Amino acid sequence: MASVRKRKMAKSSVKKVSRRNKDKQKQVNIKGNPIIAENWDYSLTLAQNYKKLGLKVKMGKFAGGEEADLSKVIKKDVYEHSAFSDDESEDEKDSQGEEDEDDVNLEELNSDGEYDESKIPEGEARIKRDDDGNIVKVYYGKRKAIDIDMDVEELRRENEKNEVKTEVVKKLEAYASRPVAKKERGLSQREDQWLEQLYKKHGDNYKKMFFDKKLNVYQQTENVLRRKILKWKELHNIE
């Protein structure tokens, strides 16, 4: 036979704590847009899905917490310390290595880790050297600088030319630019009855309608009442 305490615990309204399946609770269910829902990969995170679809999670720059892009690999020379080398030569190598590392801008590299000329500003160049310091290739910048006097629409068109769009983005743009019929707001049943009472009592005298405290409870102005009465007349074919 159970003790008094156990019987009280069994009758208590407080439920026993149980584990829950967090993955099922936090699973994203895309319902807003059919194109995004069709191409959404539930095995990836939100940021990874947006990057794959060609969208942006945030319009500005991230302050941190971004996933490292492992496709861009920068080869670094292994530093070999020799007991017979001079201190001055070592310092020169260290400073030169630091300068080379600082000069590399990750935003100017492509997926293969090579310089992309379309990402380098026009009038600048980037030099690629081999292990001995000899020049292998020179990348000349082709990205044009932004003109301050340029029109906003013209600037937007220029950015759209340089921007590489995914198939999902193209479908979304076509979906957004489709012609949509404008749906006008109709009168509700109660609003129709209220306008009918106003018209039967005051006719076309909108000033009296405005000062009618019993019918015009929300103190709608003469112009608002006029527009609503004209709409009501058109609906009921009243001249």
Swiss-Prot record:
InterPro entries: Ribosome_biogenesis_Nop16 (IPR019002). Residues 1-23 have a biased composition (Basic residues). Pfam families: Nop16. Keywords: Nucleus, Ribonucleoprotein, Ribosome biogenesis, rRNA processing. One of its GO terms (biological process) is ribosomal large subunit biogenesis. It is found in: Nucleus, Nucleolus. Residues 85-115 have a biased composition (Acidic residues). One of its GO terms (cellular component) is ribonucleoprotein complex. Residues 1-31, 81-124 are annotated as: Disordered. It comes from the Eukaryota. Involved in the biogenesis of the 60S ribosomal subunit. Component of the pre-66S ribosomal particle. Belongs to the NOP16 family. This is Nucleolar protein 16. It comes from Kluyveromyces lactis (strain ATCC 8585 / CBS 2359 / DSM 70799 / NBRC 1267 / NRRL Y-1140 / WM37).
